[in-house]
Design a protein with these regions (language model features):
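ATP-dependent adenylation/nucleotidyltransferase module used to activate substrates
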Residues: 1-152, 163, 172, 179
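AMP-forming adenylation/ATP pyrophosphatase catalytic core
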Residues: 126-132, 136-353
Length: 353
């Protein structure tokens, strides 16, 4: 009897080719698109390359018809609201910079989809993610599109039921396969933005969710001297230079957000660099738990190339990451992910420098 696999189909080329490859490998493939957005107007206007708009559903359905596999749209709105939107808003209200895609991967695209898939008798779920899976995840062959940073907090149970069939292919090869078999999404652009804020106006979105406007306050320098007025903490993130509206003879950047005093601390570039950061909410992938210092490569944001560091386990279960060279703008709320030999060792949330 064929093993059954549910493929999360975003309407993009990666998940479409993943479904094709799994069918070729002999699996009983079912395509599913996750309907996650509550606001129908935003759902309709979601950008062409997005993963949750009407165009995504239409594209995924056309691919499923071309591959001759069953296809369904499943409602995950409640889970998306709880685990992604509410988290996103809460973090910004705390003057932190969240990773909504990481939360979506763990709690919606994996936990919720896997639960629903096992209920209908599936053995696995599969995605178009580009890493390669105690279970671990290896860097993709496509460094520019590697998604392991956003997958660090998957559980062992989730990984044991996960297939990632395109992990050994680079993006040009994936598009080539799609063209060769006549998939209608072969040249479709990759999605880049947060899908539920297509206009990038985070402050208006958060105001709509909370019913509260962000409060103006003071820009201050590192000594506490007032430099001007800011528009509200949610408009700023660590390392930001543009849009400050402050005149200065030298470039200035956001150094710190202080929700307790509603202040934005500004600094010169050199003050953004530091060697250490504390990381909490650790998910261990290649180890049960660290008990002694280890060497690793640390990534402190999605676009970060990674840098050598030493991880020091702390008595409270957190990690102190000490980088060999100072790193720029380590930002509370962002994920820090650590690698050994191209495999994800562990990761967590940056709490402070």
């Amino acid at each position: 009897m064929k093993e059954k696999v549910v493929v999360g189909m975003s309407g993009g080329v990666d998940s479409s080719v993943a479904a094709y490859l799994l069918k070729e490998q002999g699996y009983d493939v079912i395509g599913v698109t996750m309907q996650i957005w509550q606001d129908q107007d935003v759902f309709v206007q979601s950008q062409e390359g997005g993963c949750c708009g009407l165009s995504a559903v239409d594209d995924a359905r056309r691919v499923a018809e071309r591959l001759e596999i069953p296809y369904y749209v499943m409602n995950f709105r409640e889970d998306f609201q709880k685990y992604v939107i509410d988290y996103f808003v809460s973090e910004y209200e705390k003057a932190r910079t969240p990773n909504p895609c990481i939360a979506c991967n763990r709690y919606v695209k994996w936990e919720s989809l896997l639960h629903r898939s096992l209920e209908i008798g599936a053995d696995y779920i599969a995605t178009g993610q580009l890493p390669n899976g105690r279970y671990t995840i290896r860097n993709s062959v496509t460094a520019a599109k590697d998604q392991t940073y956003a997958l660090y907090n998957l559980t062992q149970e989730q990984l044991s039921h996960t297939l990632m069939p395109v992990g050994d292919y680079d993006k040009p090869h994936i598009r080539q396969i799609a063209e060769e078999i006549g998939l209608p999404v072969a040249t479709k652009h990759d999605s880049q933005d947060i899908c539920f804020v297509p206009d990038h106006d985070y402050s208006s979105f958060i105001a709509q969710e909370t019913g509260k406007e962000s409060m103006p306050g003071n820009f201050v320098d590192e000594e506490g001297n007032v430099m001007g007025q800011h528009r509200g903490l949610i408009h700023y993130t660590i390392g930001q230079r543009k849009g400050l509206g402050i005149s200065s003879t030298t470039p200035i950047f956001v150094r710190e957000l202080r929700p307790e005093t509603n202040e934005v601390v500004l600094c010169k570039s050199e003050s953004l660099f530091s060697h250490d950061c504390h990381v909490d909410n650790i998910n261990y992938m290649a180890e049960e738990k660290l008990t002694e210092p280890v060497r690793a490569i640390g990534k402190i944001r999605y676009s970060h190339a990674g840098a050598p560091c030493t991880l020091y386990p702390q008595p409270d279960g957190t990690l102190l990451a000490q980088f060999d060279e100072p790193q720029r703008a380590m930002t509370p709320g962002q994920a820090a992910v650590f690698y050994q030999d191209d495999h994800v060792l562990c990761g967590g949330t940056i709490e402070k420098e």
